[in-house]
Design a protein with these regions (language model features):
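Thiol/disulfide oxidoreductase modules built on the thioredoxin-like
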Residues: 73-83, 94-100
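Local sequence-structure signature of Cys/Sec-based thiol-disulfide redox active-site neighborhoods
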Residues: 21-53
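Bacterial N-terminal signal peptides
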Residues: 5-14
Length: 162
């Protein structure tokens, strides 16, 4: 169990500080939380299609194996108690969700883009507004940019490699 906690803590830190902070969003959610559904729909179902370099990691906090990772994220975010969703993007942490956060995330993501990338994102956003289903169908590979975190899979991976 200590090994799992240690691995989860390390992975939790790497999720928060991964590569370029503006290219990674981590959502800590519960399947029974209505605001989590809104957050996941907007981020995993919209932003990931608008921003070709965005990766979204979703962490189901109702899975006990993911508890240490969630607790580490709360600690790093300076949150004293739980609650979901918790959304980590860049150096920002948000607990709860409203559509207003979507604009803030776009602003943060846009800050690291060059003009060509901004033009592409604007074009993608317009296409999503015109016909999201058609755009998603043409860009189905973007579904791979949404990762489901599993602490148990991380713990089992070294054993399977042997």
């Amino acid at each position: 169990m200590k090994k799992l906690s240690f691995l989860s803590a390390i992975l939790g830190l790497s999720l928060i500080n991964a590569a370029s902070a503006s290219e990674v969003i981590t959502i800590y959610y519960s399947p029974s939380c209505p605001y989590c559904h809104y957050a996941r729909n907007d981020i995993s179902g919209r932003l990931v299609y608008e921003y070709p370099n965005l990766t979204v990691t979703e962490v189901d906090v109702s899975n006990p194996d993911n508890g240490p990772t969630y607790l580490e994220a709360l600690k790093r975010c300076g949150l004293k108690s739980g609650g979901v969703p918790v959304i980590v993007y860049g150096d920002k942490c948000e607990r709860g969700y409203s559509g207003l956060l979507l604009d803030g995330m776009r602003e943060l993501l846009n800050a690291s883009l060059n003009e060509e990338e901004k033009t592409l994102v604007a074009s993608n956003r317009k296409a999503m507004e015109e016909d999201a289903d058609a755009f998603k169908a043409r860009n189905a590979d973007r579904k791979k940019a949404v990762l489901q975190f599993s602490a148990k899979a991380i713990e089992e991976a070294p054993a399977q490699a042997q």
